[in-house]
Amino acid sequence: MTATGKPAGATPRPGTITLARHGEPALSRDVRLTAAEYRDFWQKYEIGGLLPGQTPPPLLIDFVERCGVLVASTRLRAVESAQVVAKGRSFTQEPLLIEAPLPPPNWPSWVRMSPKLWGFFSRFFWWFFNHHHGEENRAQAEARAAEAADKLAELAASGQDVVVLAHGFFNVLIGRALRKRGWRMTLREGYKYWSTRRFERP
């Protein structure tokens, strides 16, 4: 027996997995765009960083301080978010965690909407009608999320907590994959910037 009362060599209880969305990007969403303009907007969004001066929620900071592994998507907004919460500690950048694409429907140029509405319709058409415009499709994104879930579960298997700084929708896909693997969601803060979803093994 060990000092904790567990048999020597016993498998440790897996740590938790916390999926956090990045902070608010610097790119302004206060515009109305055509489909073509939204494509350009999304490309800029994908390479852009964070709006300066943000303060992450105390709960997320606490999760990061107590975690054994901190991982971020390779997108700049996720990397900068991880830098804010890491406070100097090292973290891993993982390309597997980037956001699923948002190609807009091919609607005429007289249709102008906010980026938020374009994002909604783009995701709807991508999810239900396989509108991917030659980019990653739903099945491919779900397979990538399943691979990410397996890697995160492997990291947590030793008993250390894992925190991920990534993206709103792809975090949802990872969460679905984790639940299929027996993980239970114990915290869900919605879809706002810096929000978290926390998973534990029963």
Residue ranges and their predicted role:
Residues 78-80, 171-174:
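Short, well-ordered alpha-helical microsegments
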Residues 17, 68, 160-168:
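Generic beta-sheet signal
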Residues 64-65, 152-160:
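Glycine-rich phosphate-binding loop signature in dinucleotide/nucleotide-binding domains
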Residues 96-113, 118:
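Signature for phosphate-centric chemistry
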Residues 25, 170-171:
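Short active-site segment of divalent metal-dependent hydrolases/proteases
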Residues 1-96, 115-125, 129-147, 200-202:
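Active-site-proximal alpha-helix that buttresses catalytic centers in soluble enzyme cores
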Residues 28-34, 103-108, 177:
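Short aromatic-enriched loop/helix-cap "lid" or pocket-rim segments at secondary-structure transitions
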Residues 37-40, 182-202:
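Domain-level recognition of soluble alpha/beta enzyme cores
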